[in-house]
A protein has these predicted regions:
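Conserved C-terminal portion of the radical SAM core fold
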Residues: 1-59, 71-95
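Hydrophobic alpha-helical scaffolding
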Residues: 12-19, 65-72, 127, 162-169
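Short secondary-structure subsegments characteristic of cysteine-rich extracellular domains
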Residues: 63-75, 82, 186, 190-191
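Radical SAM enzyme core and accessory elements
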Residues: 84-191
């Protein structure tokens, strides 16, 4: 009688209609449960969680920008407004933590001094929400004159040399560019 659903917000080409499609799917799950549950007296709890898209190296979306934290929160609010059933719980990832993840996923050597400054200011175990203190990272970025948006909300050009281009994973840029094009066209790549 418990269902957990996990979605990602902020993917390239995502629209408000896509976000509302999540709510529609959740209500279809509830309806399917009502139509098929053996013991309806126990009720249904649907836990919905959304993550904030982080463009990662060696993926077709490595060139994409991350939506702003404000836009992510707007989409979270839009979704939450459409969850009117008491059986739905909704949580979303911290935009600050996801932005920091994007910075370090796409970062370069300029981030070394930022990490050092953050650690010296007491940043520890920052992958855990209960320990994460964005202000320490914010101060470290400012002290090192590094702008986070250079790594997050800026898209990369297809011809741009990326910090991870020196690493050979056995799959070239051409493959990722082809997959990116297929994604934008809504095509599935067969196995």
């Amino acid at each position: 009688n418990n269902v957990k659903l996990y979605f990602m917000l902020g993917l390239p080409t995502e629209t408000d209609e896509d976000v509302l499609g999540i709510a529609e799917l959740v209500y279809k799950v509830i309806l399917a449960w009502k139509e098929n549950a053996v013991n309806k007296k126990r009720g249904l709890r649907v836990h919905v969680a959304t993550a904030y898209f982080v463009p990662k190296p060696f993926t077709p979306f490595q060139w994409e920008q991350q939506i702003t934290p404000q836009e992510y929160l707007r989409r979270c609010k839009l979704l939450k407004e459409h969850f009117y059933s008491k059986s739905i719980e909704y949580d979303y990832h911290s935009p600050d933590l996801s932005c920091l993840e994007a910075v370090f996923a796409r970062g370069d050597r300029r981030l070394g001094p930022v990490i050092e400054a953050a650690v010296k200011s007491g940043a520890r175990l920052d992958g855990w929400d209960e320990y994460f203190n964005y202000s320490k990272w914010y101060d470290a970025f400012r002290a090192c004159n590094v702008e986070e948006s250079f790594y997050t909300t800026r898209g990369y050009g297809e011809e741009e040399i990326l910090p991870w281009d020196t690493i050979d994973i056995g799959v070239g840029k051409k493959f990722f560019l082809r997959e990116r094009k297929r994604a934008y066209e809504g095509l599935v790549t067969p196995d």
